[in-house]
Amino acid sequence: MSTRREFLTTALAGGAAAALGPRRASAAPKSMSVVHESSFIKAFDDYFVKTLSPEYEKLTGIKVAYEPVSVGSMLTRLTTIVETKAGPEIVHTGINWPHLFDQGLLDVTDVAGEVGKKIGPWHDNILDSVVVNKKWKAVPWGNIGQLEVYRTDWFKEVGVTKFPDTWEDLLAAGRLLKKKGHPFGFELGHGFGDNHGWMYPLLWSYGGREVDKDGKTVLIDSDETAKAVDFCRRFYKETMLEDVLGWTDVNNNKAYLAEQISCTNNAMSILIVAKRDFPDIAKVTDHGLNPQGPKGRFHLYNPQSHAIAAHAPDPAAAKAFLRWLYDDKQLSRWLVAGDAYYAPFLNGYDNHPMWNVD
């Protein structure tokens, strides 16, 4: 079974005073709020609400409210916050959202720089997601890595003893498994993570791309894209449950744990929940790399970050909270509480003990 490590591959203008961290002050706000999409790992949310928020209130007198948003709804919530200039001042962003909401988010280059100096440096691969026009618009706390999740026992029943290395080999295995009553289930609906978590890598593995390296020249209409789409059509028709067309990110988790499917792409959440609630399923669950296509093997980054909304009434207080939250004393505990579901983009965590817990 894959180990967790395998599975995942500057101060405020106040200077020295800011470096001392959060402190009580007569002008400090009495409260602030953070909006987050609900995590697939409930303990991650619970740790913030039950441990981190009370600790910060005890330290500073500032109560930090935590607003959970249902899975798949964060982008809509963020759009409303930015357009109405109202709501929580600290917001959850995903993937490339800082680029979409550039004008609605404050510059947090100083915070990111300080965090990078203390527990970094930052991995270079995060910069394209959160740095907009040379300014950090969000501070990442981790990546939600994805692999292929599959039932080793059912694969063995059809003679497949290791996870297929190419898309065509996975298609062949899927045909056999579907005939045995163990179809695949890859999300093809209007989700937000699992659909593009496998479809972008599939597109890239055939040489397709949306735009050129300049980020402007549109290249999606190509022979390579057509080949990827044709494979996707066959993959769906010959291996999957029909209702994947209406799935969102929660459906494949539920289907796998209900033993309705033998393979899907997912983060660690399926295995984490299986180990807790379905130990017999966990024993026969493993992970494989995304298959190769004619142009190689690819995976998609899914960075999760905090940003400060432009309407924040006290940007200095919001930054002070993020500095405290991203201090190793807090951040490492939070990540561990979440079963290392999120892999930070900070070199200081590359060899953290949490990666050795299976």
Regions found by a protein language model. Give the residues of each.
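Glycine-centered hinge/linker elements that transmit conformational signals in sensory
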Residues: G174-L176, K180, D214-L245, N290
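Hinge/lid segment of periplasmic solute-binding proteins
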Residues: G94-L147, L171, W198, A282-G288
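Short amphipathic alpha-helical coupling segments at ligand-binding clamshell hinges
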Residues: F48, L52, K227-F231, P313-L325
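Conserved N-terminal structural module of periplasmic/extracytoplasmic solute-binding proteins
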Residues: S2, E6-Q103, A112-P121, K134, ...
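Short helix-initiation/N-cap motifs at beta->coil->alpha
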Residues: P68-R77, W167-L171, V244-L257
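C-terminal lobe and pocket-closing loops
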Residues: S269-A282, P294-D358
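Extracytoplasmic/periplasmic solute-binding protein
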Residues: N133-W141, Q146, L171-V218, E224, ...
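Paired acidic/hydrophobic, glycine-rich loop segments that form the ligand-binding mouth/hinge
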Residues: E89-H92, S262-A267
